[in-house]
């Protein structure tokens, strides 16, 4: 196919146009008075949502070059979502603001490479200041505030997530399920999560969330490498196919030929199956597999116990209520086998007491926490499917934001932190940078005020006036868009996780700097 090539300003302007279209669509959702966006779906009802990254993923333009701009800014949103789980709209607004101002300066003759350096130095300065000002999350009140804010100012959701974290611990697993009623309820069940995801993306059942969801599955645990599918697994697969229940395979590894056979069975709809590599190494892997088998009332198929794959019966397999597998993790939600789990926990506690090695004790503590903590399941209630999808997205954001807050602390929300730091950045840049590097830093200094401007605009206020008002106060003072007041953000509970604020700026600056240093675009030419 022939290509279309654009250079310099033409290239950057085409990218900027695509970025503007996406930013406008996403930024209408920013703040407590942000509006919703309706997404048309090829199948099923339209989706009404308020989530930046979901909107960004849906936007695709006819013009190839503008679409490249959309894809670039979408990357800033997606990366922020992957790292912090929230702050995607802020990242989009920041990236767009840096690009717009940078383009003006490049057109006026500034050196793009020097501007890029200035942007990077300014970003590092702001990130270090966010870390310096962040307050650790010490009480349940702060957790409720973060969760409420991220779920769209829903205090009940905030309390529910705080309650869930209290029950399963700060490292615990919180899972979302679609409920059967209109009420959202919290349930604590036995279960555990480990950091290994599906071996092949062909196993995915929910392509939108890129995860595998299995209800009431069998689980095969083995410390062996699965090689000859015909001899080893076929008898078992045939037994499971008769039950019409899904299967989760947790093994040391699966060879290519064996994996191909399993994937083909999955794609043909013969068997709903997913394969995952077992966590850990050596003896620790065996112990973790045993923990999981006890949790699910199954057996580990290991040669140490004289068992082989070709003799496996259904009653040797683990059973779970639900399994969720993403590319990075596997969550098993089990049904009560409390007595067995308790005695296993007691056994691990005794091992901790008798162990001399600090490393060994740490790993045992980790196992104990995973096994005894359980999983908090929030059953999301809604009147319609459209409301259900929106609620699940908001709850997902709230859970991610809460975990991010626990990790790196909290700062004043509503764009206030960036506005206060922008004054310090201005002074620092004037004293430490010169020429085009200084221009790059001042671009960031102005850009970081844009999220607050947009929050104020969405609430019907003048963004520039609000920014100046906030700047004239102390660090903890900001703008409460819901009520239109200048308030103490900590007292009012308008707080952001430091990790979200940091990630949004880092990813936005990274993408924006790349766009400003773009000199040529090559895209497929559309034939008339």
Swiss-Prot record:
Official protein name in the record:
Chaperonin GroEL, chloroplastic
Q: Supply the HAMAP family for this chain.
A: CH60
What reaction does this enzyme carry out catalytically? ATP + H2O + a folded polypeptide = ADP + phosphate + an unfolded polypeptide
Task: Name the Enzyme Commission number(s) assigned to this protein.
Answer: 5.6.1.7
Q: Which UniProt keywords apply?
A: ATP-binding, Chaperone, Chloroplast, Isomerase, Nucleotide-binding, Plastid
The enzyme's first-digit EC class, named in words, is isomerase
Where does the source fall among the domains of life? Answer: Eukaryota
What molecular functions are annotated in GO for this chain?
ATP binding; ATP-dependent protein folding chaperone; isomerase activity; unfolded protein binding
Query: Into which family does the record put it?
Result: Belongs to the chaperonin (HSP60) family.
Q: Which PROSITE patterns match?
A: CHAPERONINS_CPN60 (PS00296)
Residues that bind ATP: 29-32, 86-90, 414, 480-482, 496
GO CC annotation: what is one? chloroplast
Q: What does this protein do?
A: Together with its co-chaperonin GroES, plays an essential role in assisting protein folding. The GroEL-GroES system forms a nano-cage that allows encapsulation of the non-native substrate proteins and provides a physical environment optimized to promote and accelerate protein folding.
One GO biological process this protein is involved in is:
protein refolding
Q: What does the UniProt entry say about where the protein is found?
A: Plastid, Chloroplast
Q: Which NCBIfam families match?
A: GroEL, PRK00013.1, PRK12849.1, PRK12850.1, PRK12851.1
Quote the subunit structure annotation: Forms a cylinder of 14 subunits composed of two heptameric rings stacked back-to-back. Interacts with the co-chaperonin GroES.
